[in-house]
Design a protein with these regions (language model features):
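Glycine-rich, basic loop-to-helix element that forms the pyrophosphate-binding segment
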Residues: 1-19, 42
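Short beta-strand-to-loop acidic/aromatic patch adjacent to the donor-nucleotide binding site
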Residues: 21-34
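Short, flexible, basic/aromatic active-site loop/helix in glycosyltransferases
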Residues: 77-110
Length: 278
């Protein structure tokens, strides 16, 4: 049975916690990641030093283009005011060459860390409610990092540590199913974690932006991706109440770190900016 990213790691971490009850840290590492020599030490030392740190990632570089950042996390994940995730070194499908532009400071607070290679504080992981298995694949780590943030934990990127990631291994880089999950899950984590008024405002704006994205897919002769966007919205509306009115008593809040107070869609598609800094 394929439990997905969330289900697989949740099961593994429950077993590990039971066997090693005093374990402090664990690394979620995808099978298509190639760590570099010495990558682990700076992550572990930082976690030991900073008790408020819930999760940390290394730089994620492209296995096929070693001088470039890789899609899944690059130099640390951010979120724009419309709820679109992007990363330092990666906006939508465009990735930057790693020229050391994000190397200083060595540790930077971000909003979300890459699930491809993610060191977590085990206690924070369980305190935050584990990975949400309803998301199955794509953006589960963003949801987890958001909930860690709500519990008072910080998320960081360590640029003195790096790994290479092949990417697109589960569903493929241009899979319509990946498009479906990305659009649906990004909406679900907003209504789940953002204050209700903020979430409703964002969803209203996303109707326009996602429709524009669908039109772009059609213009590019990718009708299956347009259908995926439409399916994503119908699925989101069906699951809305389940996520918006969760039985948990967890507070909802907008991110404190790693938030870009602008529209990444506007800057990328209209202003043609391929790199966006906070």
């Amino acid at each position: 049975q394929n439990l997905g990213y969330s289900g697989g790691y949740n099961r593994a971490l429950r077993i590990i916690k039971e066997k090693y009850p005093h374990l402090q840290f664990s690394v979620l590492l995808n099978s298509d990641v190639e760590p570099q020599e010495g990558w682990l030490d700076p992550l572990e030392k930082r976690m030991e030093k900073e008790a408020s740190l819930g999760a940390i990632q290394p730089k994620i570089l492209d296995f096929h283009k070693p001088n470039n950042f890789e899609y899944a996390g690059a130099a640390g994940g951010l979120l724009d005011k419309c709820g679109y995730p992007f990363a330092r070194g990666r906006v939508f499908d465009d990735t930057e060459e790693d020229k050391g532009q994000y190397d200083y400071p060595e540790f930077s607070k971000i909003f979300w860390a890459s699930g491809a290679c993610l060191m977590i504080r085990v206690s924070a992981f369980f305190e935050s409610g584990l990975l949400d298995e309803r998301l199955f694949a794509h953006m589960e780590e963003i949801d987890l990092c958001w909930r860690m943030n709500l519990k008072g934990y910080d998320i960081e990127c360590c640029t003195s540590s790096s790994v290479f990631h092949v990417g697109g291994g589960t569903l493929g880089a241009i899979s319509p199913q990946k498009t479906y999950l990305n659009f649906r899950n990004s909406l679900l984590i907003i209504v789940k974690n953002a204050p209700t008024i903020v979430a409703l405002r964002i969803i209203s704006g996303r109707l326009f932006f996602d429709a524009a994205a669908g039109a772009l897919f059609l213009f590019r002769r990718q009708p299956q991706h347009l259908i995926s966007v439409i399916k994503a919205h119908f699925s989101f509306y069906k699951m809305f109440s389940e996520f918006a009115f969760s039985p948990s008593n967890q507070k909802k809040s907008w991110p404190k770190h790693g938030l870009y107070n602008g529209s990444v869609v506007w800057n990328y598609f209209i202003r043609k900016k391929e790199n966006i800094n906070l």
